[in-house]
Amino acid sequence: MFSSLYPLARASLFKMDAEDAHHLTLRALGAAGRTGLACALSARVPDAPRTVMGLTFRNPVGLAAGLDKDGAAIDGLAALGFGFIEVGTVTPRPQPGNPRPRMFRLPQAEALINRMGFNNHGVDQFVKNVQAARYRGILGLNIGKNADTPIERAAEDYLYCLERVYPFASYVTINISSPNTKNLRQLQGAGELDALLAALKDKQQRLADLHGKLVPLALKIAPDLDDEQVKEIGDTLLRHKIEAVIATNTTLSRAAVQGLPHADEAGGLSGRPVFDASNEVIRKLHAEVGNDVPIIGVGGIFSGEDARAKLAAGAALVQLYTGFIYRGPALVSECVKAIARERTA
């Protein structure tokens, strides 16, 4: 039902400020989930199970982190047919993020620019929201560091968040690739990443012993990486036996949107312009890690064929964000069906 109405809703939403529209949509989805009206949103998406990270996904098309930073609309989002939901990024303490305006549409390029800055209500409220959700599918919880935590102490924030979210997560994503937190991408450097992942894997094992279950870790990386950086990241993922990698986050490049309104705004660019760069990182990363570290492909998926291209590049699963905002829930079903056809062809 919601899929057929979305084009009308989008016309109204796109007349609003981008962030106001975002919050309005989340509030509506959250209310639908809390009141049981989510069943009215339910999309008819076929099952297409895949097992990745030791988890069985209802279908391989997920929601990327960033849409629901506080986990406040999990049930409403789950009704739209996603095979898995990822919420966050959450930080140890609440923080407002960067000053508004901080989200911009580039409709001519089917893109967004955001410099949100990990705005969220903190991990304690996040955990309460996750616990209140009725959704029992695969749920990824995405964690980051507070803006005022020195980069040299970033590991402390990740370790704290990991401990808090661990009992409630199907998997936990380590976000070190947002361009909107100062110096965060430094953690993708070989030495910094090695130290961070060593600490996280040690914590993961101790939490697994405590809770009697091993919750997989996924690392989210940027598209703005050269060949040597991709190789170093691949080597580090293999060495620490990280369970998955999400490729990719938003880009700082503006090559594909030069001259468009808002193109010069600071922040990360997402949507169609990042599609090729994301696929290139996926291909190069897959050449390094093979099937030992499953890749979750995200960036610029606007059609079923786009989703298939991500898998052809080496991804095991895909996630939607900007394409979902532009095309709505119909994109989820289209991607699942396209991938299912590929497997049966």
Curated annotation (Swiss-Prot):
The active site is at 178 (nucleophile). Keywords: Cell membrane, Flavoprotein, FMN, Membrane, Oxidoreductase, Pyrimidine biosynthesis. SUPFAM superfamilies: FMN-linked oxidoreductases. GO terms for biological process: 'de novo' pyrimidine nucleobase biosynthetic process; 'de novo' UMP biosynthetic process. It is a peripheral membrane protein. It is found in: Cell membrane. Substrate binds at residues 69, 114-118, 175, 180, 249-250. FMN binds at residues 65-69, 89, 142, 175, 220, 248, 271, 300, 321-322. This is Dihydroorotate dehydrogenase (quinone). It comes from Burkholderia cenocepacia (strain ATCC BAA-245 / DSM 16553 / LMG 16656 / NCTC 13227 / J2315 / CF5610). The lineage of its organism: Bacteria, Pseudomonadati, Pseudomonadota, Betaproteobacteria, Burkholderiales. The gene is pyrD.
